[in-house]
């Protein structure tokens, strides 16, 4: 499943506008990915929270990654588009850190496809009380 550049830019702009409604100040980007409890969003970044309430800040360039697109789609299906709160992913912080590591290693196309299939299968078997077992079934690279 690929998303064309025009639709991706439209999606990114929609998320930026929603995020802009909530932020009060913008600071300059110091690192590519951070986890913290601060409320301001660095310029050129977007923020997501995990199911265990950990905050992650990503550069906007990550929006073009198919894995990140799939995570945002899962979030939208699970929680809807946030109007009064942050974007929340239905995964814990350890799983998201694992995905970030794989994205930063610039995996090949076959590995990316396998990971997307794993995320989809984990999502289809996702139950709130089975959350840990669903994420443990993912492929490890």
Swiss-Prot record:
InterPro entries xref list: SAUR_fam
Gene name of the record: SAUR62
Additional facts recorded: Plants over-expressing SAUR62 display twisted inflorescence stems, and increased length of stamen filaments and petals.
Recorded superkingdom: Eukaryota
Disulfide bonds: none
Alphabetical keyword list: Auxin signaling pathway, Cell membrane, Developmental protein, Growth regulation, Membrane
Bilayer disposition of the protein: Peripheral membrane protein
Name of the protein this chain belongs to: Auxin-responsive protein SAUR62
Tissue: Expressed in stamen filaments and petals.
A Pfam family this chain is assigned to: Auxin_inducible
Keyword Membrane: yes
Subcellular location: Cell membrane
PANTHER family documented for this protein: AUXIN-RESPONSIVE FAMILY PROTEIN, AUXIN-RESPONSIVE PROTEIN SAUR61-RELATED
Family per record: Belongs to the ARG7 family.
Assigned GO CC terms: nucleus; plasma membrane; pollen tube
Annotated GO biological process: auxin polar transport; auxin-activated signaling pathway; ribosome assembly; stamen filament development
Known role: May promote auxin-stimulated organ elongation, such as hypocotyls, stamen filaments and petals.
